[in-house]
Design a protein with these regions (language model features):
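Bacterial N-terminal signal peptides that target proteins for export
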Residues: 2-13
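Bacterial N-terminal signal peptides
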Residues: 12-24
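Sec-dependent signal peptide cleavage junction
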Residues: 21-33
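Long, acidic (Asp/Glu-rich), low-complexity accessory segments flanking structured domains
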Residues: 32-85, 98-140, 197, 201-205, ...
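Loop/turn elements at helix/coil->beta-strand transitions in domains of secreted/extracellular proteins
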Residues: 85-90, 141-147, 172-174, 190-192, ...
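A motif-centric signal for short, conserved binding hotspots located
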Residues: 93
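Active-site groove signature of glycoside hydrolases
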Residues: 96, 141-157
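Surface-exposed substrate-engagement region within the catalytic domains
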Residues: 171-304
């Protein structure tokens, strides 16, 4: 009887030891096949710098419905759908407009209005409309973050006024924003929108500038360069590297995109933006036709798992390309 009890005690002790060891073993890295497009950031470690990841983004994100669509449409899905597809960087073009005596921010692409529907009588899409979709997505998917890169689209607008109206809109939901000018870790911004701005600070002395500074020199020159990128400063310690050769023809643009994918400079201290969009020289046609060629190439590209490609910004952005990009953050399926 004593021997039996001792054996039982030893077995129980052994089981406890095994369970204790198993509890201390870290979970294996997430496999690409198990990743959901709505929650793909969930298994990325909290300490990962947002700049040292592969993040799908969209160019002129609010142009699903837009005036003169043949020229100005760059997306065929809503912002809400883009987020569901897995895109986490939104390119926002802001213009001041007076409504009921008050200035508000609306979305445009150049001179073309972004709209809430395809109706010719549709009202203009507002920043508030977009933020509503972003907030709703983050509420349902708190593991995620969304970078909103704001550009003052109308050169006649006073940038100080754009800043003031933008900051006032953000102040209504301050807990849902990351507003520092330093690259955060993913853990710092889960469930939040990250503000990035492409305009210089024009507010009076005493007013604090908000958000990451994403300003870069125009890259509309058609000169073909071996290195198509340009660097700028986020702050004294961190930099921005951008490829936005928006006037290259298809073949030259694809070469520029590949150069940046092959030689990505994404790092803890460097945000790397690789725009795949182009308006070209007119040889192929409108943005949708350019995107058709470029997106086929992106889908066929040999993406490497474990490599940080930075933010890859896409026109007419399909779910399958978002998947190709964000799956590089994870281990391949076995």
């Amino acid at each position: 009887m004593k021997v039996t009890k001792r054996r039982l005690w030893l077995c129980a002790l052994l089981i406890c030891m095994v369970l204790s060891i198993l509890a201390g073993i870290a979970a294996p890295p997430a496999m690409a096949a198990n990743i959901s497009s709505t929650d793909w950031m969930e298994t990325v470690p909290d300490e990962t710098k947002l700049s040292n990841m592969s993040i799908p983004g969209t160019h002129d994100s609010c142009t699903q419905y837009v005036d003169m669509r043949y020229i100005f449409q760059c997306q065929d899905a809503s912002v809400a759908t883009q987020l569901i597809y897995g895109y986490r960087y939104l390119d926002m073009r802001l213009v001041l407009e007076k409504r009921s005596g008050q200035e508000t921010l609306v979305l445009k692409h150049n001179i073309a209005r972004c709209k809430v529907s395809d109706s010719p009588f549709s009202r203009t899409l507002t920043l508030a409309d977009v933020l509503k979709d972003v907030y709703a997505f983050l509420d349902e998917h708190p593991s995620e973050t969304v970078i909103l890169c704001m550009k003052a689209e109308n050169s006649k607008d006073d940038v100080a006024d754009v800043q003031s109206v933008l900051y006032e809109a953000i102040s209504r939901e301050p807990d849902l924003w990351y507003l520092k000018n330093e690259i955060p870790t993913l853990g710092e911004v889960r469930g939040k929108a990250v503000l990035a701005t492409r305009f210089d600070d024009k507010l009076p002395v005493g007013f604090e500038r908000c958000g990451l500074y994403f300003g870069w020199a125009d890259q509309g020159d058609r000169t073909i360069l071996a290195d198509p990128t340009a660097d700028s400063v986020i702050n004294g310690r961190e930099t921005l590297c951008v490829q936005d050769r928006y006037n290259y023809d298809v073949d030259d643009k694809i070469t520029a995109i590949h150069t940046c994918l092959d030689n990505s400079r994404a790092a803890d201290d460097t945000f790397f933006l690789n725009f795949t969009s182009t308006s070209g020289s007119g040889k192929v046609g409108h943005p949708k036709e350019y995107a058709k060629h470029i997106n086929l190439d992106l889908y066929a590209y040999a993406w490497e798992t474990g490599k940080a490609y930075g933010i890859v910004i896409v026109d007419f952005a399909p779910k399958k390309i978002a998947e190709k990009i964000y799956q590089t953050n994870f281990q391949p399926t076995q």
